[in-house]
Regions:
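Enzyme catalytic cores with a strong preference for nitrogen-chemistry domains
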Residues: 1-216, 232-233, 268
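ATP/NTP-dependent adenylation/nucleotidyl-transfer catalytic domains that generate, transfer
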Residues: 129, 155, 181-218, 223-478
């Protein structure tokens, strides 16, 4: 008996990603997404069947609306690296002569996206000889932050209307009115980045049922930045901090942490960990034949702090925010079940150099409007010069500095960006000017740290390539 082999259409999911028209008669689907991304964080072919075009809706007044969904607009090979094979939804609409084309999008934030979206829409508008209305979702969903920033582009590719990013806003655009250049606020990537992180924390907490958050304050720059973001997202009265000094914590770090909390209006509780360190030493000594030392002793300090943070967050029903950065996650300069403990890694997609840049901006006059918008102190220091200027240190042993174990962050981060985001390897890295010994060392560290990243808290994606669902590498790779 002959049995027909299943085709690709048979295997395709039955769902479509669609636009629905809602009116007095009810609702009906009027357009289906054609280009289904399956790269980075996107896996739409697993869930959806691609639609066919062109997608055109004629209104009762005779106006013809072209309809596209997110990736259907991303068909310019010159502007992006990830170009999907398949139909050209914009090209399909050209002979239909639409009056306006609308693109409904759920496009997650990264630092390069806002400008890229406008360039893609401008290219489409010039091809179609009609305005393009780009409408982007606003809000955080797990690791993704949808930053909004909707706009209208004229048939000649010029902006007609722009909405701010990372906030809900409704605006009316009259397609028959005389076009006017919109009021454009200065483009500030650090402003956009900070607002995206605040939105990500706010929505993650709200959607997970948390009203309050907790973090550990060390007096270092990473925890300081997370404290500022959390305060902006949730309010100072909803954020608590623990100071957990060890014998190796400097007086300056403790003072800096207390001063930061005072500037932000945060509650602080100090829990010295020396008694717990002594207890672990006494308990482990019979098994080890000596007190823990070296990296084991350093990791115990981090795990003691992680346990205290988890206990308080558990008891108080708080969201624990972990404070590690992308540079540390990349090379494994973090402690599993210690400083990695938490429900959300707020700056886990920020390289250390980006942390410094964002903190410098927060303490500059350029951040004043943003500080006012989030009810942060509108004058004076936020992070503080003492925190921004001190050499980074985990303070897990006497006189420890990050530079004892890691290369200079400017060299390390430049190499990590080429490895992770630009996907360069071997001769390409050497041609880019990276030190051969550093390349070999960092490549090995990046591979070996995968087991830690697999168990890390979810992080907020704010770069083109983040660790998380879009980063899929084996743990055991030889």
């Amino acid at each position: 008996m002959y049995k027909r082999q299943p085709t690709d259409d048979d295997r395709a999911p039955g769902l479509t990603n669609s636009i629905a028209l809602v009116d007095r008669r009810g609702w009906r689907a009027v357009a289906h997404k054609q280009l289904l991304p399956s790269y980075d964080v996107f896996d739409e072919r697993r869930y959806f069947r691609p639609g066919t075009g062109p997608n055109l809706l004629q209104l009762p007044n005779g106006q013809r609306l072209g309809l596209t969904i997110c990736e259907d607009l991303w068909v310019d090979d010159t502007l992006q690296r990830e170009r999907l094979e398949g139909p050209d939804p914009i090209g399909q609409l050209i002979p239909e002569r639409p009056d306006v084309v609308i693109n409904l999008a759920a496009s997650p934030f990264d630092a390069d996206k806002p400008l890229l979206r406008q360039k893609l829409a401008a290219t489409a508008a010039r091809r179609l000889h009609c305005p393009v209305v780009y409408l982007n979702q606003v809000g955080g969903n797990d690791e993704l932050v949808f930053d909004g920033g909707s706009f209208v582009i004229s048939a000649s590719g010029d902006p007609l209307l722009e909405l701010p990013s990372c906030c809900d806003q409704i605006s009316l655009w009259d397609s028959e009115a005389n076009p006017a250049n919109p009021d454009r606020s200065p483009d500030d990537p650090l402003d956009r980045l900070f607002r995206a992180l605040v939105l990500g924390v706010r929505d993650y907490a709200r959607k997970c049922g948390f009203q309050t958050a907790l973090l550990g304050l060390s007096g270092g720059i990473d925890s300081a930045l997370v404290a500022v973001i959390a305060t902006a997202a949730l309010g100072a009265d909803q954020v608590s901090t623990l100071l957990m000094p060890s014998p190796w914590s400097s007086a300056g770090s403790i003072d800096d942490a207390v001063a930061l909390a005072k500037r932000l209006g945060l509650k602080t509780t100090t829990l010295p960990i020396r008694p717990l360190m002594d207890g672990f030493n006494a308990t482990l000594n019979p098994a080890l034949g000596e007190d823990p030392n070296g990296v084991t002793a350093e990791n115990l300090q981090s795990r003691i702090r992680g346990t205290l943070l988890m206990a308080v967050a558990n008891q108080e029903g708080q969201l624990l925010l972990t404070t590690g950065n992308k540079s540390e996650l990349a090379v494994g300069y973090c402690t599993l079940y210690g400083d990695m403990n938490g429900g959300l890694a707020v700056i886990g997609d920020l390289y250390k150099t980006s942390v410094f840049a964002l903190c410098d901006w927060l303490d500059s006059p350029a951040s004043r409007r943003c500080r006012e918008d989030y009810s942060l102190p509108d004058h004076g220091e936020l992070v503080g010069d003492a925190i921004r200027q001190k050499p980074p240190s985990a303070e897990l042993r006497p006189d420890q500095k990050d530079s004892d174990s890691l290369p200079d962050y400017s060299a390390l981060d430049a190499l990590l960006k080429d490895l992770i985001q630009e996907r360069r390897h071997g001769d390409d890295l050497l041609a880019a000017g990276h030190n051969p010994a550093l390349v070999s060392r960092v490549e090995q560290l990046l591979k070996r740290a995968e087991f830690k990243r697999r168990q890390a808290a979810p992080l907020l994606k704010v770069s083109p390539q983040a660790f998380g669902s879009g980063w899929r590498l084996p743990i055991a790779c030889g």
